[in-house]
Amino acid sequence: LSCRHLDVAADGTVIAGYQFEGPEWESHPLICRLDTDRRFSELTLDDELTASLNHYIASVAFSRVSGNVLVTAPRGNRVLLLDAVHGNLVANLALPDAAGARCDGTGGFLVSSGQGGLYRVAPDLAIPELLASLELRWDNHLT
């Protein structure tokens, strides 16, 4: 198990994403949280969703407008939006090879794809909007 990426909210809350390199048949939480009282917890998603992430969270980005945090799972082609206070799943969106993530300042997020796409995830949680398709390969960083 290794910590791959993290982000820190304005209030000091930390959310981090893991990579689990154990046996494929084992399952482990892939997201953890350190709150402002220094309480550490791992966020548990349902087993089917956790398995679909294929043991890897790539990027983490807090919204600077809402109480949400977005995490990307490129191996599972997923973007998850979580309530940063309680860790509850707000949205589970399909996005191919979702890699980098960053808040856009309006309550939404920008997400890059390892396939060259740059997407916007709007605050209304509609299907991610393709902003650009480029002849390049994004990795896990947009900052």
Feature roles, as predicted:
Residues 6, 60, 101, 142-143:
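Hydrophobic core register within WD40 beta-propeller blades
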Residues 11-13, 65-67, 106-108:
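Short coil/turn segments that connect the beta-strands within blades of beta-propeller domains
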Residues 15-17, 71, 111:
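Residue position within the beta-strands of beta-propeller blades
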Residues 22-29, 72-76:
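Short, solvent-exposed loop/turn segments at conserved positions within beta-propeller repeat blades
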Residues 1-4, 27, 56, 75, ...:
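Beta-rich catalytic cores
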Residues 28-37:
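Beta-propeller blade signature
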Residues 111-143:
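Blade-level signature of beta-propeller repeat domains, shared across WD40, Kelch, NHL, RCC1
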Residues 1, 47-52, 94-100, 134-138:
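Short coil/turn segments at the loop-to-beta-strand junctions that recur within blades
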